[in-house]
Amino acid sequence: MRILKPYLRSTSIQCYLCLLLNSHFLTEACIPVFILSCINAGLPKTEANWQDVISDLKIIDKIIQSLHIDATLYTESDVHPNCKVTAMKCFLLELHVISLESKNETIHQTVENIIILANSGLSSNRNITETGCKECEELEEKNIKEFLQSFVHIVQMFINTS
C-alpha cells in the first residue's frame, strides 16, 4: 500500500545553474553546487494528487460495500466554492470515523493516505479564513455511500481550481 506519492522536481533550473557556474567560475567551485543540485533534483516531493485521493475513495467504497457499515457521517452535500477548505477539513475528520468503524487495515491505510495527500494540498490554503461556512457538527448526517459521493465532489472542486 502506498503512503506518499513521490515526484521529481524539475531539473532544468539545476542544469542551467550548473552551466552558468561552469561558464563563469572555476570548475572546483561548480562541483559542489552541481552535486547538491543533483541531490535536490532527486529528492521526493509530496504533492496533493487529487486524482489519487479519488482513487483511494473508490477503494474505500468497494471495501465498505462488503463490510456493510451503518455509520452516519457529517456530510456537506452542497459545498459553496468559498467554503471548500472548511468542508474538506470536515470530510477529513469524518474519515477517521470510517477507519474506526471498519476495523479494517486496508481502509485504515487508505484513510491515512488520503489524509496525507489532502493535507499536502491544503497546505497552501492553511491561512485562508472562510467566513459564513457551516461547522462540521452543523452538517447533515448521511450514510457512508452519500458521504463518499460528496467527498469525491469536493475533491473535483479542488481539481477544477488547480
Curated annotation (Swiss-Prot):
Keyword flag Glycoprotein: yes
Signal peptide stretch: 1-29
Residue stretch(es) of the prosequence: 30-48
One GO cellular component term noted in the UniProt record for this chain: extracellular space
Molecular functions (GO terms): cytokine activity; cytokine receptor binding
Record's subcellular location: Secreted
Assigned keywords, A-Z: Cytokine, Disulfide bond, Glycoprotein, Secreted, Signal
GO biological process, one term: interleukin-15-mediated signaling pathway
Pfam families cross-referenced by the UniProt entry: IL15
Disulfide-bond pairs as recorded: 83-133, 90-136
SUPFAM superfamilies, per database record: 4-helical cytokines
Top-level lineage group: Eukaryota
Glycosylation positions in this chain: 104, 127
Summary of the function given for this chain in its UniProt record: Cytokine that plays a major role in the development of inflammatory and protective immune responses to microbial invaders and parasites by modulating immune cells of both the innate and adaptive immune systems. Stimulates the proliferation of natural killer cells, T-cells and B-cells and promotes the secretion of several cytokines. In monocytes, induces the production of IL8 and monocyte chemotactic protein 1/CCL2, two chemokines that attract neutrophils and monocytes respectively to sites of infection.
Family: Belongs to the IL-15/IL-21 family.
Stated name of the protein: Interleukin-15
Primary gene name: IL15
